[in-house]
Amino acid sequence: MRLNNELVVFDLEATSNQADVGTRPALQTNNFIIEIGAAFLDRDLKLIDTFERLVRPEEPITPFITEITSITPAMCEGQPLWKDIGPEFEAWVSRHCQNVKRVRLAAWGNYFDIPLLRRAYAHYNLPFSFSGTCIDVKTMAMAWRALSGRRTDKLGVGTVASEMGIVPEGRYHRAL
């Protein structure tokens, strides 16, 4: 399989106003990024490079977020703000392709990651140069499961990875 453009698969971890570990928060995109992880894939889906940074948020990291991500306030304390990481991320993408506007972004659940990424750039008045198609990996996994006769409710990264024979390296709810 050969793509017509390069692919940047990325994930964000973010703050939340949810403090209680026992309940799940409502979906939010107005929080601050605390970690970005990305993999740059060429047109043949070959891994070219990875990018991972912790980000200092402008609001506290709650116990809920630490519980699900293992990211503590101390880990982000001395890290740069997104105003420094955003341009670094774009420069990293630019090193691997000729036209950043044509790069395809892909994330598990575009309804969260893409708006949060756009908001982070806008918050610091940074240009958002990524204008290509955004691929929702969760939607693709849901279609694959449905076409395979499997249930599509409670669809998580762990379930799909296991069904595809992918052994995770690291922890879920960490960006890379």
What are these language model-derived features?
Residues 12-24:
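Short acidic, Gly/Ser-rich segments with clustered Asp/Glu that frequently serve as metal-coordination loops
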Residues 1-3:
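A short acidic-Thr-Gly-centered motif at the start of a beta-strand
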Residues 77-91:
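Glycine-rich, highly charged phosphate/nucleotide-binding loops
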Residues 5-6, 29-36, 40-71, 91-176:
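Metal-dependent phosphoesterase core characteristic of DEDDh/y 3'-5' exonuclease domains
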Residues 68-80:
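Short histidine-centered catalytic/ligand-binding loop motif
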Residues 7-11:
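Short, hydrophobic/glycine-enriched beta-strand segments
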